[in-house]
Amino acid sequence: MLHPSITKVLSRQFTLGVWLLASCWFNFARPMGLRAEPASDGQVSGTASVEPIVLFDLTYLFQLNLGDERQRRRFWDESHLVAALEGLVNRTQPRLFIRYLKEPDDFWWGQMTQPGGWLAKRQIVRVGSLDELLKRFRGFFQGAVVWDERVPATANLASTIAGCDDLLPLRFDAQADSLYQHLIAAPGAIPVKVRLLKENGAQLFSGTGLIPGTSMPSSGSAKADAYRWLIEHYVRTGKTNPLWLGYYLDAFWLNCWRAAAPENHTLCNQDFVIAHRGVLFDLGVWDDEVPVDDPKQRLGTDPDTLKGLLRATYDRIHGNGIIQVAGFVPWAYKYTSARSPAWFAGGTHDGVPTEWHYAEILSCFNACMDADALGLGAMANASFYQHYPLAKRYPQNPKPTRANLAAQGLLDAQGRIVPRTYVAFYVGDYDSAAWLYRELPAMWRDPARGQIPLSWAFNPNLCQRFPLGLAWARERRTTNDWFVAGDSGAGYLNPGDLSPPRRFSGLPSGLAVWEQHCLPLYQQWDLTLTGFIIDGDGPQLTAAGLAAYAHFSPDGIVAYQKKYEGVYQGMPYLPMRADLDGTPVEAARAIREQTRDASHHFYVFRSILKTPSWHLAVEQAVRESAGDAIKVVDLYSLLRLVREYETETNAPASWNRSLEH
């Protein structure tokens, strides 16, 4: 994700065995019988199910006064319960769609239900109340798991247990008007199957003595003890799906809710992880400071617990797979130095270093992010979208050849590169299903799209939570819309941390499983280029790492740390030069300043959530100031030129070759 201006976002409001292992778990949510077979590349066919789709509008919750304690808890409780219910209901088929975030939900609902859409022939049933919704889907849950607000982490435990045991999460609340009392004490009550507090109402997790139900001494933190209990009783015992985790804010949100817009609690994101029986967690990553939500814990307790969770998950699959973690550091609320008029997140580390540190820890355990960063991090209905029937392959525009480069005027009549500066726009950041779901409609409806080459960095693993969006974009591409993998492939991790020594885990190399994870997704989405490899503060790619990328990303990589360009085993590579921001004129000026070095001729510039109209204005401003001396091309053409440049006879006589091999 790598957001140098992260606060601006808020202001805008395997081997075959590995693949079979993933498929076994994936069948919880997408059995083979529901997958439509492709009629041809990029097209699917299938028979619509006769089961109706239920639509429930939950947007009434945003009318509540969150400044009122009771209404704030209602907002949390109902959002939490409905997200869990949706995950259970949609586990094997798309049955329930929640209207939660009006603009994106209405847009994608409209796309699915319009003539010719995925749901065009499906019966739609609108349910008007929460009670009616629970009654309709009573067969999908066995009871309730009750959690303890005094230990906010138990909200995430409840979500995890809900997915594993087919339960609904309920916050214990003795007040008569609470959701708990309404569902537990009323006629036809939902039975309580698991209690995360004692029968007498005392805390189950106290941070003293032994961790309940184990012989393990307490960590001294009720928060950490709760997660360590979960690891022992659900992760190590095989109840959870080791291939999916979710890093989402726990119920501490009830204290710090003013830090960001209400939907940034990201409860609506939990449905997918619950559907897949994954683990939900919220833990800090720094061992040199205590977290704002647990200031009395000893230093390092949160990150030690996180590493314990990741190691237990890694051990479940014997290291033979990539663990995918939806969500992101809740930086506006916890674990960073973020400060707003209403809240201080309590840390000393800025957002980007915290992101990088978290990425390093994940990477050392073969885990990657689907990085739902706050500001645009909320996403509803991923458990529904996951059932969208994808084709086996989505071809994109034909990759450039020497003949194509010549036709574009990039090679002269002698086959040499025309001497000028070549620039490509890396259009990010789409390493998050939530960001794609929120931003894609505006980007794809921009009237300037298609006028200049843009290289869209849609991570291919987003097809697991938002296949509809990826397919929709591909089906509406222009000849100037190019697609590359974003940070750092089929998921955001630091690939340098896949090679030993892996300082946070000491585990053997994960490069082979990373390659096996990426390859089928690259093939499905016709990707042969990785537009950004984020190394953060971690180690650079080793020779083995470069070789792995050469296998599944043979048309090139763009790296964050590397300050040179070259070709490795036939794979060209370049450094990412700079992030473009500000007005188009300011961005054009930055390009002019960055490209003054006469020894370099190929440049990649990154933008974050910038529209096609903005990029067009930047390109026009560059042309006005530089004329034909700077040429904007797509990333595939740019890196093909780098490969051509490796051949002495194809380089202009005026250029000095300075590549590393």
What are these regions (language model features)?
Residues 15-27:
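Bacterial N-terminal signal peptides
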Residues 2-18:
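Bacterial N-terminal signal peptides that target proteins for export
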Residues 459-520, 524-527:
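Substrate-binding cleft of extracellular glycoside hydrolase catalytic domains
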Residues 37-392:
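Preference for solvent-exposed, low-hydrophobicity sequence contexts
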Residues 147-150, 327-330, 420-421, 425-430, ...:
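Short loop/turn segments at strand-loop or loop-helix junctions that form parts
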